[in-house]
Amino acid sequence: MTGIDDTPPAWDERTQLTTFLDYARGTARAKCKGVSAEDACKALLPSSPLMTMSGLINHLRWVEYYWFQVVFLGEADEGPWTDEDPDREMRVAVDFPLSQLLDEYAEQSARHRELVAGQALDAKAERAVRDGLHVDLRWILLHLTEETARHNGHLDILRELLDGTTS
C-alpha cells in the first residue's frame, strides 16, 4: 500500500489517479486484517442492517466490476443484484468467508489495473450512465476512489465497534 507520506512532488495524472485508487483499495483490505469470519458478518449499526465488513468488501468488488466491465467496456451485467434486490451483493456476502471476498476483490482490482493501463484516460465508456452521458475513464477512476474512500470510513466504524481498532 502506498502511504500518504511517500507521495512524490510530481506525478503525471494517470499515476495520481491509479495510485490514489490503489491506496483506497489497500486501506479497505488493511481494515479487515485480523477480523474473524464471524465478526466480518456482524451488522453492528441498527440503522444499516446490511452493513457488515464482508458486505462492504463484496460491494467494493462488484462496484468495480460494474463501472469497469459493464459501463466502460459495455459487457453484460452479471452482477449479483436484481431489480427486486438491488443490494444483494451486501446481503449474500455473509455466505462467504471474508478471506475469499478479499481474494476476489484483489483479483478484480488486478484485472482493472491491467485494463486501465491500456486505455486513454479520456476514453469514453461504452454505456451511458444517465441522460445519454458517456463518462470517461478518468471519471470512473475518480468515482471509484471516492466510493472506496467513503466505504473505508464505514469499515473504520465497524472495526472500531468490533474490537476497538482505530488505525
Describe each PLM feature range:
Residues 88-125, 138-144:
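Acidic/histidine-rich alpha-helical segments that form the ligand environment
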Residues 1-9, 97-103:
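Long, acidic, intrinsically disordered low-complexity segments
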Residues 2-8, 14-87, 127-167:
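Short, contiguous alpha-helical
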